[in-house]
């Protein structure tokens, strides 16, 4: 996969872990698409994206961004996601593997899939 050839090892590890969590949690009708060297996950519409800082146009200077396309529609009861300047896409930036809260991500993925099934 070309993505892994262009990003440094610390980003590669974070991307790998996030992709594994996502692919294990998404239902069979959801797919992954690599575009611009970035993994996009979608069902009926976009669900989430994993964007390493090394890849241009991601809007972050370091780390790996996990963004939810319809983050504004998620309850996010734990306030895990950053709202930023985008009104729709809410995200979390990971600079280290230890920052990844698997339970929080799974909870958000379940919410996102539930929303996607209503579209």
Feature annotation, model-predicted:
Residues 1-119:
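Charge-dense, helix-prone N-terminal extensions
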């Amino acid at each position: 996969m070309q993505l892994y050839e262009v990003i440094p090892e610390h980003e590669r590890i974070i991307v790998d872990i996030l992709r594994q969590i996502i692919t294990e949690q998404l239902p069979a009708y959801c797919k992954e698409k690599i575009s611009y060297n970035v993994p996009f996950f979608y069902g009926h519409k976009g669900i989430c994206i994993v964007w390493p800082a090394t890849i241009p146009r991601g809007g972050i200077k370091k780390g790996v961004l996990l963004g939810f396309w319809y983050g504004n529609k998620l309850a996010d009861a734990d306030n895990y996601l950053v709202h930023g300047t985008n009104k729709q896409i809410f995200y979390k930036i990971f600079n280290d593997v230890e920052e990844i809260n698997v339970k929080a991500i799974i909870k958000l993925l379940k919410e996102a899939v539930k929303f996607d099934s209503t579209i």
